[in-house]
């Protein structure tokens, strides 16, 4: 089984003046989370979707799933206190319902510009190498600074990548490291890749696209709108 685990547990504090969590903001009468879910719904290799949602909005999400005919979502469950805990909750639900050898693609509900090719590459990488993290090369230079804002090192861009999503693993492996982290009282994982590498797993790079952005601010939302408008214009005018 190939299962998408979609994290929609944030409340979007960086979205100024918004009364909705960022995943429920609408573009052309369609919420961001639905744009995201449609990509996995339409991918022929995805068998099921589990969504971890901020709890007060679960009923609203279920209404959206019905309205937009999203049929692959099998379960919507409440998130935890942190992103790490929310992902763990979702993984435990997948464990209850699916095989331990399932491939799990962990993706942000506010990353709607994912495409079929990236989804398929993630699945193939897990089956070939046991893991996958979607990345793209940086276009600017990273510098390492100290506590006094003095540059201490300049990273080689050719050896750097921007971490994106999906981040994909066998269910048995990602659950194992989450449980180990809980035993160790480790709660500071930035994402699934950082948790896997902390506990000694190699994570294989998968090529992504720069427009696969995470919508966390008003600027991100306007970039998303511009990309959607461009895609629509290309379909109409060629």
Swiss-Prot record:
It comes from the Bacteria. The record marks 14, 22 as: Transition state stabilizer. The record marks 157, 214 as: Positions ribitol 5-phosphate for the nucleophilic attack. GO terms for cellular component: cytosol. Keywords: Nucleotidyltransferase, Transferase. Belongs to the IspD/TarI cytidylyltransferase family. TarI subfamily. InterPro entries: IspD/TarI, ISPD_synthase_CS, Nucleotide-diphossugar_trans, TarI. It comes from Vibrio parahaemolyticus serotype O3:K6 (strain RIMD 2210633). This is Ribitol-5-phosphate cytidylyltransferase. The lineage of its organism: Bacteria, Pseudomonadati, Pseudomonadota, Gammaproteobacteria, Vibrionales. Gene3D superfamilies: Spore Coat Polysaccharide Biosynthesis Protein SpsA, Chain A. Its EC number is 2.7.7.40. HAMAP family: TarI. The keyword Nucleotidyltransferase applies. The keyword Transferase applies. GO terms for molecular function: D-ribitol-5-phosphate cytidylyltransferase activity. Pfam families: IspD (PF01128).
């Amino acid at each position: 089984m190939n299962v998408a685990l979609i994290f929609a547990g944030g409340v979007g504090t960086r979205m100024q003046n918004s009364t909705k969590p960022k995943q429920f903001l609408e573009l052309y009468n369609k919420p961001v989370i639905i744009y995201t879910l449609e990509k996995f719904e339409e991918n022929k290799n995805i068998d099921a979707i589990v969504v971890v949602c901020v709890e007060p909005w679960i009923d609203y999400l279920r209404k959206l799933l019905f309205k937009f005919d999203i049929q692959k979502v099998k379960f919507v469950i409440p998130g935890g206190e942190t992103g790490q805990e929310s992902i763990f909750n979702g993984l435990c639900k997948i464990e209850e319902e699916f095989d331990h050898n399932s491939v799990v693609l962990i993706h942000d509900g506010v990353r709607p510009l994912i495409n079929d090719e990236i989804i398929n590459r993630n699945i193939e990488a897990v089956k070939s190498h046991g893991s996958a993290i979607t990345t793209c090369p940086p276009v600017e230079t990273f510098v390492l600074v100290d506590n006094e804002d003095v540059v201490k090192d300049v990273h080689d861009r050719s050896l750097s990548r921007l971490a994106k999503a999906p981040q994909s693993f066998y269910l048995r492996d990602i659950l194992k490291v989450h449980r180990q982290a809980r035993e160790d009282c480790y709660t500071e994982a930035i994402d699934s890749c950082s948790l896997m590498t902390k506990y000694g797993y190699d994570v294989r790079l998968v090529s992504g696209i720069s427009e696969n952005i995470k919508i966390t601010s008003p600027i991100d939302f306007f970039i998303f709108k511009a990309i959607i408008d461009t895609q629509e214009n290309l379909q109409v005018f060629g």
